[in-house]
Regions:
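N-terminal beta-strand motif that seeds the catalytic metal site of vicinal oxygen chelate
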Residues: 1-29, 76-78, 127-133
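Core segments of cupin and vicinal oxygen chelate
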Residues: 9-13, 19-60
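Residue-level marker for the onset of beta-strands and adjacent loop->beta junctions
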Residues: 16, 48-49, 76, 109-111
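Vicinal oxygen chelate
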Residues: 22-26, 78-122
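Active-site beta-strand termini and strand-to-loop segments that position acidic
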Residues: 53-57, 115-118, 128
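Conserved beta-strand in the GNAT
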Residues: 61-63, 114, 123-126
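A short acidic/small-residue loop/turn micro-motif
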Residues: 68, 107, 128-132
Length: 133
């Protein structure tokens, strides 16, 4: 008997949502809305409210940290693409993010770095450096 084929996981939009664990989701969604201009802010109702931002079809969910998942830099890092690395890096720092790794130059004229949000979570940033000379 042949095994049942597995359903396709990777679709045209493989990433649906990213969860960021924070001690104060309301404060975090306000910060991320300022840090990620153009995002659309949502809040699902009680009893367990969920705060999230819609970033062009990818949901950034700000959820309470707990005994299973703490806030902070451990684990995976999601890298966000930007068309202007230097301007986006400066904007995030102005919003209160702290540089953690980099920035550094990588292949094909791209730059990348990791920053920490005010709760210690890592934000990966990647994109081209724009020559302003």
């Amino acid at each position: 008997m042949s095994p049942t084929p597995a359903p396709a996981i990777v679709a045209s939009r493989p990433i649906l949502a990213v969860l960021v664990h924070v001690p104060d989701p309301e404060a975090a969604v306000a910060w991320y809305a300022r840090a990620l201009p153009g995002s659309v802010r949502h809040r699902l109702p009680e009893p367990d409210p969920v705060h999230y931002l819609d970033l062009g079809g990818v949901m950034l969910e700000l959820v309470p940290c707990d005994e299973k998942v703490a806030s902070g830099p451990a684990g995976s890092v999601v890298y966000w693409h930007t068309p202007d690395f230097d301007a986006s890096f400066a904007h995030l720092v102005a919003c209160g993010a702290t540089p953690y790794r980099g920035p550094g130059d990588i292949e094909d004229g791209q730059r990348m770095c990791q920053l920490r949000d005010p709760w210690g979570n890592c934000i990966g940033l990647r994109g081209p450096a724009i020559d302003r000379e």
